[in-house]
């Protein structure tokens, strides 16, 4: 972008992406992350494998963040210098909303769908600011309710073209009319620095991938205690308090590997529609989630309920037999229908009347290790509503709470031994143009202090088997626990 164009855009925009396209068909997203982000805090890598198989068009490398919005002692807290005009204390959700509104910038034609915004996670427990579910006083992990990076520099790999688009966002932090030429020069200098970093040779020798094994792990709330809780929930369901409740267990195992190595193994062994690596201040998040929470693009909102699971078959014939069995299971179908209704109700709160519809109902979607029943629900975002409103209306996912949501979450709060932290919240972005894309934070590891924390839940209904539900939690956590253990042994 030349200086004259930049000056014109600067008259009514606080964020302007300055870009440079390079041919980079010899690099991978992981190599780009190594070269550009160098595994620094405040960086990320976002990828996607459609249906767990073919790679999506774009991968996003977060190279640098201008500031980080987090929470401390229940109050919004910024690391770095926040933009002028946004809250620096108070409700962290309100601070997030205000930041997105203050930096709102129309999407620039010809650029990828994401060029900058607030990127990170909202933990499950931030729902306490949206619903009265209980105090959640037990909090052994003490993870911030949210951590969102104000992304200034990123690189977008276009797998179709074999190109990389470097983006340096010129952010008007002070909301002043002065300093326009200097801001352009600074953005160009950052592009130069990223281009130079791409020329660096980064040692990444092949590493022997050891056989996948389930490591030894500890359960915070498992076995007999969890099964007793399942029986308790079943009694509450029979009494009419809820239709379904989704309790969860947290597992932990040693992690000596880097967050990047855990991510490398997870993307190789369990590719999913949402794959992410975040390096935050003091902890890391690595995940491979199969399920969107909600996506907003060009004023259209979409949720993608997933419920009902079978393993993949060893042969095409066995695979189809398992799919037929899944679709014929009345319990799985009933649970899925309930979640579709939840999705319709959630979108109905923030979409135009009559616009919410189920566009794909109960199809089987296959991933690398499992298959699920999936549906797609869409709606047109109502006037005066934003992607932030849509996100909070759908938060948290019914698949991680139950139905009806408020009472199911109250029961979870009464029974689970500690706050959930990241698990059951969401990971993704709210961009400056008014769009968003978030995944449910499942199949995800929190890495901190040499330990990996992995959490998984099971949907309990009136006829659930406590032993089977306990095992389901362990089965769901297994892929991530295995990835951590494999990463610990890379090259051995």
Place the predicted regions along the sequence by residue.
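Extended alpha-helical targeting/anchoring segments
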Residues: 1-492
């Amino acid at each position: 972008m030349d200086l004259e164009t930049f000056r014109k855009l600067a008259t009514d925009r606080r964020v302007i992406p300055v870009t440079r396209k390079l041919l980079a068909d010899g690099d991978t997203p992981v190599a780009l992350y190594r070269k550009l982000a160098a595994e620094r805090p405040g960086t990320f890598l976002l990828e996607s494998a459609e249906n767990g198989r073919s790679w999506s068009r774009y991968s996003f490398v977060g190279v640098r963040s201008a500031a980080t919005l987090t929470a401390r002692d229940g109050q919004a807290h910024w690391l770095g210098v926040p933009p002028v005009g946004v809250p620096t204390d108070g409700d962290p959700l309100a601070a997030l909303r205000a930041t997105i509104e203050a930096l709102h910038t129309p999407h620039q034609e010809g650029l990828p769908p994401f060029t900058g915004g607030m990127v990170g996670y909202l933990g499950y427990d931030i729902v306490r600011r949206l619903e009265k579910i209980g105090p959640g006083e037990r909090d052994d992990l003490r993870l911030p309710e949210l951590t969102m990076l104000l992304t200034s520099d990123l690189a977008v790999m276009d797998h179709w073209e074999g190109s990389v688009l470097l983006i340096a966002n010129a952010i008007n932090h002070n909301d002043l009319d002065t300093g326009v030429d200097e801001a352009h020069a600074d953005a160009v200098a950052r592009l130069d620095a990223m281009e130079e970093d791409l020329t660096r040779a980064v040692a990444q020798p092949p590493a022997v991938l050891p056989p996948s094994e389930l490591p030894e792990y500890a359960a915070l709330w498992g076995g007999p205690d969890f099964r007793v809780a399942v029986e308790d929930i079943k009694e509450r369901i029979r009494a009419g308090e809820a239709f379904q409740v989704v309790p969860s267990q947290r597992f932990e195992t040693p992690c000596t590997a880097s967050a990047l190595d855990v991510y490398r193994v997870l993307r190789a062994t369990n590719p999913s529609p949402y794959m992410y690596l975040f390096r935050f201040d003091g902890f890391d998040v690595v995940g491979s989630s199969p399920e969107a929470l909600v996506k907003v693009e060009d004023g259209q909102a979409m949720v993608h309920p997933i419920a009902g699971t079978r393993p993949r078959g060893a042969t095409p014939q066995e695979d189809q037999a398992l799919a037929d069995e899944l679709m014929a299971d009345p319990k799985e179908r009933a649970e899925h229908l309930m979640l579709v209704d939840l999705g319709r109700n959630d979108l109905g709160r923030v979409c135009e009347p009559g616009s919410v519809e189920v566009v794909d109902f109960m199809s089987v979607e296959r991933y690398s290790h499992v298959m699920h029943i999936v549906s797609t629900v869409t709606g047109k975002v109502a006037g005066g509503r934003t992607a932030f409103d849509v996100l909070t209306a759908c938060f948290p996912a019914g698949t991680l709470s139950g139905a009806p949501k408020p009472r199911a979450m109250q029961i979870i709060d009464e029974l689970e031994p500690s706050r959930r932290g990241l698990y059951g919240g969401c990971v993704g972005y709210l961009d400056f143009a008014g769009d968003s894309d978030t995944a449910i934070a499942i199949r995800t590891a929190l890495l901190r202090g040499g330990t990996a924390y992995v959490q998984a839940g099971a949907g309990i209904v009136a006829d659930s088997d406590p032993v089977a539900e306990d095992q389901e939690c362990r089965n769901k956590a297994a892929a991530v626990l295995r990835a951590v253990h494999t990463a610990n042994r890379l090259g051995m």
